[in-house]
Amino acid sequence: MKKIKCALIGPGNIGTDLLAKLQRSPVLEPVWMVGIDPASDGLKRASEMGIKTTAEGVDGLIPHMKADGVQIVFDATSAYVHAENSAKVNAQGAMMIDLTPAAIGPYCVPPVNLKQHVGRREMNVNMVTCGGQATIPMVYAVSRVQPVAYGEIVATVSSRSVGPGTRKNIDEFTRTTAGAVEKVGGARQGKAIIIINPAEPPLIMRDTVHCLVEGKPDEAAITQSIHDMIREVQKYVPGYKLVNGPVFDGQRVSVFMEVEGLGDYLPKYAGNLDIMTAAAARTAEMFAEEILKGELVLEPVAA
């Protein structure tokens, strides 16, 4: 079976976890890992796996992309450098899957809107944030039953799973997640809160979703919709589970989730890495399948 070749930019927690997932993919083959620090653990690991590496940033990758047939690039760096990375990669005729909160391309939350991205020839799609991937399916599960006037999500993650890039991007994280709670989740107004918990041993990712619906909540239909959506997310993140809810209090619907990872890079408490990387891999696989079928031909985009 032919595979589509990929490159990863950013050998941190997210990039390293994503690499493990891509190595199991039936349609994607990771061939490059790009960093900026020659001593980085992520670059060392990639190199040991036989993957080509560069510590010269994206500029170290660009000259090799055509020769190595790289068609999909994942950016797991920081919102601040993403636009520049994306322009350089798109100019080489490769598409970009953005795992930073830069959000210059359309948001993608696979169980909600992945199919809408098929056939649109997008050269950049944004995976929102780990908090967004964990909670937006729940907001959407409510909003597809009845209108949501306000959606609020709280993502609690272990300090150890949050690397320096994510810490620098906290403001972008909350803005991008809130924007996607509205655009993808369907809430008229969205709010996002992230809590980084320093407890040791590290705590598993926890997510709380509150929705204020219009009118009296249709409890049976909302409950059914939430359980259906959880099954969809579990197809690619088996550790996604409902801890409590949906709890109905007047017009408020609350759902309490927990996300356990597969333990590919950081231990299982870091479900925030998994939900992000599994969603990105799932998205890339869909585009790769289109390319393999000849339905999607990527073309260079003038920078």
Curated annotation (Swiss-Prot):
Keywords for this protein: Aromatic hydrocarbons catabolism, NAD, Oxidoreductase
Catalytic activity: acetaldehyde + NAD(+) + CoA = acetyl-CoA + NADH + H(+)
This protein's record includes keyword NAD: yes
Domain of life of the organism encoding this protein: Bacteria
One Pfam family this sequence matches: Semialdhyde_dh
Residues that, per the record, bind NAD(+): 161-169, 272
Keyword Metal-binding: no
Molecular-function annotations in GO: acetaldehyde dehydrogenase (acetylating) activity; NAD binding
Signal peptide range: none
Enzyme Commission number(s): 1.2.1.10
GO BP terms, alphabetized: catabolic process
InterPro entries linked: Acetaldehyde_dehydrogenase, Acetylaldehyde_DH_C, NAD(P)-bd_dom_sf, Semialdehyde_DH_NAD-bd
Active site: 130
Matches recorded under HAMAP family: Ac_ald_DH_ac
Similarity remark: Belongs to the acetaldehyde dehydrogenase family.
Protein name per UniProt: Acetaldehyde dehydrogenase
Lineage of source species: Bacteria, Pseudomonadati, Pseudomonadota, Betaproteobacteria, Burkholderiales
